[in-house]
Amino acid sequence: MEHHKTYHAKELQTEKGSVLIEGPISPEKLAEYEFHDELTAFRPSQKQHEALIEIAGLPEGRIIIARFRQTIVGYVTYVYPDPLERWSEGNMENLIELGAIEVIPAFRGHSVGKTLLAVSMMDPQMEKYIIITTEYYWHWDLKGTNKDVWEYRKMMEKMMNAGGLVWFATDDPEISSHPANCLMARIGKEVSQESIERFDRLRFHNRFMY
């Protein structure tokens, strides 16, 4: 499968100034920009910057960024699922994972996350993919928002909905381990029925639930 990447951008006005939401960004461009030191949800900011540069260089890898002047203040990643996860078991070349989305506290509440997702989906290539994301409550920055688990889950769902991702049932043990965890997905308009059925088999290993 060829992974065409078509650049799109949208300017977002916030009280702190104009933020450019753009991508997919090349590894070279990513390396040129400053990476905000508060982008630490997954690993120290410098390490995360390096990880994004690496993802951007993968054939299927996509990084969409939120940029304030020359500094990255938010991003979303799309990449093949981790080989250790069940979502990679089918070796589906048209299934990619929204692996991480992060926005620094100063720019939260300005629709940056929603716009990152909306700009991601402007590329016609996204209609060829099943895009999944797995939400685990233990990854959520509850402290930074003063929200409880359910309020945060609702916020995450609304944000994912902005990119066309909706809730899907699954018997995955990690997701099933807490009712706030969930699988969300967006099935592109050009995805075949065969691929949808393969995705259904990945979602349910216990066939009686399927």
Curated annotation (Swiss-Prot):
Disruption phenotype: No visible phenotype on growth in medium containing glucose and acetoin or in medium with acetate compared to wild-type. After glucose exhaustion acetoin is quickly consumed similarly to wild-type. In the late exponential growth phase slightly more pyruvate is produced compared to wild-type. Disulfide bonds: none annotated. Pathway: Ketone degradation; acetoin degradation. Keywords: Acetoin catabolism, Acyltransferase, Transferase. Induction: Induced by glucose starvation conditions. InterPro entries: AcuA, Acyl_CoA_acyltransferase, GNAT_dom. It comes from the Bacteria. One of its GO terms (biological process) is cellular response to glucose starvation. GO terms for molecular function: acetoin dehydrogenase (NAD+) activity; acetyl-CoA synthetase acetyltransferase activity. Residues 19-189 form the N-acetyltransferase domain. Its EC number is 2.3.1.-. Pfam families: Acetyltransf_1. Part of the acuABC operon, which is possibly involved in the breakdown of acetoin and butanediol. Acts as an acetyltransferase inactivating acetyl-CoA synthetase AcsA via acetylation at a Lys residue. Monomer. Belongs to the acetyltransferase family. This is Acetoin utilization protein AcuA.
